[in-house]
């Protein structure tokens, strides 16, 4: 049900893309909120300055504005432990996020997707299949398109990719289909190294959902919110959707029905197959035929920065997996590689309080040579000092590798860490990797 904000004193906290989308949302209703950011010169400040009637504050927290407000819209990047939010909570001021605004505003059925890894890929696959079936759909949320940018569009379905940060401040979501693809340790710097808090945030996606899609290999993805919700499962060896193996072939299956041989897919790697199974589970609940779904899967090339083969020459393959910002994702990337040469693995960045020792089993592989850089380079180096090298920057790593690499090798950027110590995001890190290949190798 659409909420009336006319008598609310609204403060938007954060001037990123999400904050701007919230501002535009309220302006479209004739409401003029205040907006603030602790950065002195936020990236999108010019978009705010152009509105003459908007009060904005930068460089610090405006506590008097907080006291004057009775509704705060907070951007997902601002942690619950932020002093401003703690202050507002003590004053009993309502705090919500942009996704809460979105779900209160729309009556369009929502497909909600979360997970530590694979969210964007599954979101994109589901979108392509739904569109191929003749439905109108839009994606938004954590995928880089603020949800409020699509809220007024005509659609049969909205597909929301949701992070734990977004789910924290969402209370009214009633998804038609909800899924947690997987949960592995991530963002523990935000959750005080308590994975239970991370799991709790993810689990909110299931509340009041009609259909939940669960990963049977990852028990923490199982719906704890309601016993009566229809549940569909996927997994490697079991689940409604699963993989079936013979000596030479692997199939994506629905129960006893073989849907597609993985040899016919453009993507390889078990993590990609599992993502596809979850997407199949979602769209089949929309009564979309497997024939349509399989056609899309055959041609799906994946997304940039996700195990993306960016260059191959002289039998040397360069893979950009910059999106791997946690241990589980990096492990999946390594497992997907089949080579007779060396795997030259680039690790580095901010570990986000992760236990890097969890990488040790997969790094035992004698074919792996490790290159460490960035904020937590020393801890990464100490995992296997005898086969690791340490550098300050990604550029230094690439300069060294360009001299050492041999035919048959795979160079894999899969950092297992956040990029924010040296880059604006995983995209900039991945683009820098590609640019350095062009400069050093071409």
Curated annotation (Swiss-Prot):
InterPro entries: Mur-like_cat_sf, Mur_ligase_C, Mur_ligase_C_dom_sf, Mur_ligase_cen, MurD. Pathway: Cell wall biogenesis; peptidoglycan biosynthesis. One of its GO terms (cellular component) is cytoplasm. It catalyses: UDP-N-acetyl-alpha-D-muramoyl-L-alanine + D-glutamate + ATP = UDP-N-acetyl-alpha-D-muramoyl-L-alanyl-D-glutamate + ADP + phosphate + H(+). It is found in: Cytoplasm. Its EC number is 6.3.2.9. It comes from the Bacteria. One of its GO terms (biological process) is peptidoglycan biosynthetic process. It is an enzyme of class 6 (ligase). Its main location: cytoplasm. Cell wall formation. Catalyzes the addition of glutamate to the nucleotide precursor UDP-N-acetylmuramoyl-L-alanine (UMA). Belongs to the MurCDEF family. This is UDP-N-acetylmuramoylalanine--D-glutamate ligase. It comes from Buchnera aphidicola subsp. Baizongia pistaciae (strain Bp). The gene is murD.
């Amino acid at each position: 049900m659409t909420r009336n904000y006319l008598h609310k004193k609204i403060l938007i906290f954060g001037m990123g893309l999400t904050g701007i989308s919230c501002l535009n949302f309220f302006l479209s209703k004739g409401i003029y909120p205040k907006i603030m950011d602790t950065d002195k010169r936020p990236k999108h400040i010019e978009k705010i300055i152009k509105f003459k009637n908007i009060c904005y504050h930068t460089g610090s927290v405006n506590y008097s504005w907080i006291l004057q407000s009775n509704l705060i819209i907070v951007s997902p990047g601002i942690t619950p432990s932020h002093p401003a939010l703690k202050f507002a909570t003590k004053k009993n001021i309502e705090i919500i996020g942009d996704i809460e605004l979105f779900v209160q505003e729309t009556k369009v059925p929502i497909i909600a997707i979360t997970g530590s890894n694979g969210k964007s890929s599954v979101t994109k696959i589901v979108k392509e299949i739904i569109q191929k079936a003749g439905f109108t759909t839009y994606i938004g949320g954590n995928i880089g398109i603020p949800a409020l940018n699509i809220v007024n569009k005509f659609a049969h379905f909205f597909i929301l990719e949701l992070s734990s940060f977004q789910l924290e401040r969402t209370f009214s979501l009633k998804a038609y289909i909800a899924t947690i693809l997987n949960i592995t340790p991530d963002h523990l710097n935000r959750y005080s190294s308590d994975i239970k808090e991370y799991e709790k945030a993810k689990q909110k996606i299931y509340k009041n959902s009609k259909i939940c899609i669960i990963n049977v290999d990852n028990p923490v993805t199982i719906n704890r919110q309601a016993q009566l919700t229809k549940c569909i499962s996927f997994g490697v060896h079991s689940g409604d959707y699963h993989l079936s193996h013979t000596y030479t072939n692997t199939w994506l299956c629905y129960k006893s029905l073989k849907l597609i041989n993985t040899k016919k897919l453009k993507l390889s790697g078990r993590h990609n197959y599992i993502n596809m199974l979850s997407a199949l589970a979602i769209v089949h609940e929309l009564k979309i035929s497997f024939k349509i779904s399989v056609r899309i899967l055959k041609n799906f090339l994946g997304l940039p920065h996700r195990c993306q083969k960016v260059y191959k020459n002289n039998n040397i393959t360069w893979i950009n997996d910059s999106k791997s910002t946690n241990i589980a994702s990096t492990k999946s990337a390594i497992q997907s590689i089949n080579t007779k040469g060396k795997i030259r693995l680039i690790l580095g960045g901010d570990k986000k309080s992760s236990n890097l020792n969890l990488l040790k089993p997969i790094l035992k592989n004698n074919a792996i040579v490790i290159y460490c850089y960035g904020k937590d380079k020393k801890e990464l180096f100490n995992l296997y000092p005898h086969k690791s090298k340490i550098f300050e920057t990604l550029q230094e790593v690439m300069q060294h590798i360009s001299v050492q690499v041999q035919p048959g090798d795979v160079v894999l950027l899969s950092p297992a860490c956040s990029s924010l110590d040296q880059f604006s995001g995983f995209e900039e890190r991945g683009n820098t990797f590609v640019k350095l290949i062009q400069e050093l190798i071409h």
